[in-house]
């Protein structure tokens, strides 16, 4: 066999190696050509990602408007101050301590904190975000005069601004740094008001440690625009409501207060105010309790404002009628416990209108026991109690109802006078919409429309009916009796001259959240009503938490209703009705049907009715039968009195009434 020579073997090996290297070179050249020609853009982008990163600038959120287009929350561009510590620390002629001393009073940041920021590693650190214009202007002048522009600079950021300050603050909420919504509608509407985070990004170069380099902000992506939201709130009505609430807070020194106004036909919330409150432009100065929207989150015992619901339930269930006469003995027993009237008095023979008008506890306990706990609970659920209304706000409470299987007679009796249950203020408003609206109940809502960036309407929030708890006949009957409560009964201080109003006062002891039971000498005073009763256009609920001194709802909450509703009637352009007087001309016969029921024989203290328009004979006869003294002044019809209507008097007190022919 022929053997290969050593030279031949070496030549073959050399050829093989040469071929191998040529093949590798062809592959490498081909790959390089592919990268340079066909995949160039991808590798450039990858390279840029090693030295650049996305940085969120948080461009403007959408605007929140009231129903009439008034701005409630807007975004404005403001300056934020940053520093390049690496460049600063290379400056031999810059005294950082002196810089801190100069900037500290302007920025309201301690010198120690500033020096700490100046000494950080890297090329970028925030000094102060979202500066006030005056601050930025002063610092800008310093940068130029002190030649600090090499290491200090500004970046524009979006800041939320609330033009009306405290107005509607607990509802709107607020936005913190980094565009983070922290409460209220701002939180609830986050995804609607800010459609895309990418639209608000910028590219920044970074150093070896990943820190952004301060001068490297590149062109931001063009914002696609944001949605805007229109609320059902009317800014003018909101102002009226909050002003009346503030006056009551000052006068009564209450710990807190709530006022809500709603259209009973549509469920649109026209005003919603809370006290305490805060300025969302300076939310950092507030404390935790100031942020709370108690109108939807907190529960309370409604007291006598719940009694019209009980009356409606009994009438609709057929367990009681408007013509039923019941004799009030002043005390009624349930499960071994006595239920008494607020004044410890007895009212004698009374009909349902009297039981409502004079808020007779024994009467409602009697009605509740006749109707039964299971039936009352079923109606309470129909009226929307025990579950959230579903309004477009975060943190809504559900309230508390009895399990009817566990109810004793005392539970039924106390529920019938608005105790031993817990409701939210918004639930009360929703329930009253049924009584004001012919039995039809509407769901409260606060959003009206969501609009696209071009202004076109994206979504409309329609009126939503949530059942008919009672018939139209029953709702109208209760509404008429609630009008008597305002015109003649304990709600006299809610009367709006020229308009017929219906409503109910409420006074309830505060629940002890720690020990259970009730807090001593602490009360919730409230009034809930609507008007004008012929065609209700607004429901208004007023709640005062622990007013000092006088604490009855008819004396401290009803006047807030009166002031607010009076202004609303005029603002809405609803014409006032001519005042109806009881004519004294030729009225030689005393007509008991026209006059409020007399207090019971055993009743020592009671509310004085409104004598406006009564004749001297009518006033004198009523006062005589009530056991009160009479001091008339003038002739004609009564036009003023002392003590005033709705004030508490005792048998034997003298009542001065002035009469005139005008």
Protein language model regions, located:
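Hydrophobic alpha-helical transmembrane signal-anchor segments
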Residues: 3, 8-42
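Beta-lactam-recognizing serine transpeptidase/beta-lactamase-like catalytic domain environment
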Residues: 11, 73, 207-220, 259-304, ...
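Second-shell loop/turn segments in exported
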Residues: 51-53, 82-92, 100-104, 121-130, ...
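Juxtamembrane extramembrane loops of integral membrane proteins
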Residues: 55, 59-108
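Short, small/polar residue-rich loop motifs at catalytic or cofactor-binding pockets
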Residues: 56-60, 253-256, 444, 632, ...
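Small/polar-residue-rich segments within soluble enzyme cores
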Residues: 98-105, 117-226, 542
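Conserved, well-ordered alpha-helix/loop/beta-strand core segments that scaffold catalytic motifs
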Residues: 213-257
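Ligand-recognition elements built from short beta-strands and adjacent flexible loops
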Residues: 498, 542-553, 558-662
């Amino acid at each position: 066999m022929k053997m290969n020579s050593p030279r031949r073997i070496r030549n073959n090996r050399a050829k093989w190696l040469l071929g191998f290297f040529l093949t590798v070179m062809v592959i490498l050249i081909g790959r390089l050509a592919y990268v340079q020609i066909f995949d160039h853009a991808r590798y450039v982008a990858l390279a840029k990602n090693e030295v650049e990163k996305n940085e969120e600038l948080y461009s403007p959120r959408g605007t929140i408007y009231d129903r009439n287009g008034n701005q409630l929350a807007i975004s404005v561009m403001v300056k934020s101050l940053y520093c390049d510590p690496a460049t600063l620390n290379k400056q031999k002629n810059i005294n950082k301590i002196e810089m801190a001393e100069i900037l500290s009073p302007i920025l309201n940041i301690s010198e120690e904190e500033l020096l700490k920021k100046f000494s950080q590693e890297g090329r970028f650190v925030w000094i102060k975000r979202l500066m006030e214009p005056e601050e930025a202007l002063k610092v800008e002048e310093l940068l130029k005069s002190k030649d600090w522009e090499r290491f200090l600079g500004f970046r524009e950021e979006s800041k939320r601004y609330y033009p009306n300050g405290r107005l509607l603050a607990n509802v709107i909420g607020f936005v913190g740094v980094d565009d983070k919504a922290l409460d209220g509608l701002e939180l609830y509407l986050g995804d609607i008001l800010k459609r895309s985070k990418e639209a608000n990004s910028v590219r920044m170069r970074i150093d070896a440690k990943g820190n952004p380099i301060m001068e490297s902000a590149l062109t931001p992506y063009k914002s696609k625009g944001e949605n805007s939201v229109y609320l059902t709130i009317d800014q003018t009505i909101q102002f009226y409501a909050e002003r009346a609430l503030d006056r009551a807070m000052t006068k009564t020194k209450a710990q807190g207060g709530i006022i809500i106004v709603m259209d009973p036909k549509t469920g649109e919330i026209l005003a919603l105010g809370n006290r305490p409150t805060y300025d969302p432009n300076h939310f950092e100065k507030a404390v935790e309790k100031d942020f709370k929207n108690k109108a939807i989150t907190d529960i309370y015992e409604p007291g006598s404002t719940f009694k019209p619901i009980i009356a409606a339930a009994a009438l609709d269930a057929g367990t009681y009628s408007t013509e039923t006469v019941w004799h009030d003995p002043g005390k009624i027993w349930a499960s071994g416990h006595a239920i008494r009237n607020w004044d410890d008095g007895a009212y004698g023979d009374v009909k349902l209108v009297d039981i409502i008008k004079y808020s007779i506890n024994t009467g409602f306990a009697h009605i509740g026991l006749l109707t039964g706990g299971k039936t009352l609970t079923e109606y309470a659920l129909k009226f929307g109690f025990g579950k959230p209304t579903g309004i477009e706000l975060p943190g809504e409470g559900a309230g508390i109802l009895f399990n009817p299987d566990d109810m004793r007679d005392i539970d039924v009796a106390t529920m019938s006078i608005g105790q031993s249950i817990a409701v939210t203020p918004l639930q009360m408003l929703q329930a009253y919409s049924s009584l004001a609206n012919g039995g039809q109940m509407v769901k409260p809502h606060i959003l009206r429309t969501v609009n696209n960036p071009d202004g076109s309407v994206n979504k409309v929030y329609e009126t939503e009916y949530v059942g008919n708890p009672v018939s139209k006949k029953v709702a109208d009957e209760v509404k008429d009796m609630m009008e008597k409560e305002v015109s003649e009964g304990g709600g006299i201080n809610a009367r709006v001259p020229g308009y017929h109003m219906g409503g109910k006062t409420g006074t309830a002891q505060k629940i002890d959240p720690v020990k259970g039971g009730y807090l001593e000498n602490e009360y919730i005073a409230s009034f809930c009503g609507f008007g004008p009763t012929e065609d209700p256009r607004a429901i208004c609920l007023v709640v005062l938490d622990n007013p000092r001194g006088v604490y009855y709802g008819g004396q401290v909450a009803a006047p807030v209703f009166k002031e607010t509703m009076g202004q609303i009637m005029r603002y809405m352009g609803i014409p006032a009705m001519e005042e109806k007087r009881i004519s004294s001309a030729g009225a030689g016969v005393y007509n008991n049907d026209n006059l409020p029921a007399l207090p019971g024989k055993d009743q020592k203290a009671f509310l004085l009715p409104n004598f406006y328009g009564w004749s001297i004979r009518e006033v004198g006869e009523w006062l005589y039968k009530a056991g009160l003294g009479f001091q008339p002044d003038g002739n004609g019809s009564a036009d003023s009195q002392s003590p005033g209507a709705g004030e508490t008097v005792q048998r034997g007190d003298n009542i001065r009434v002035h009469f005139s022919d005008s």
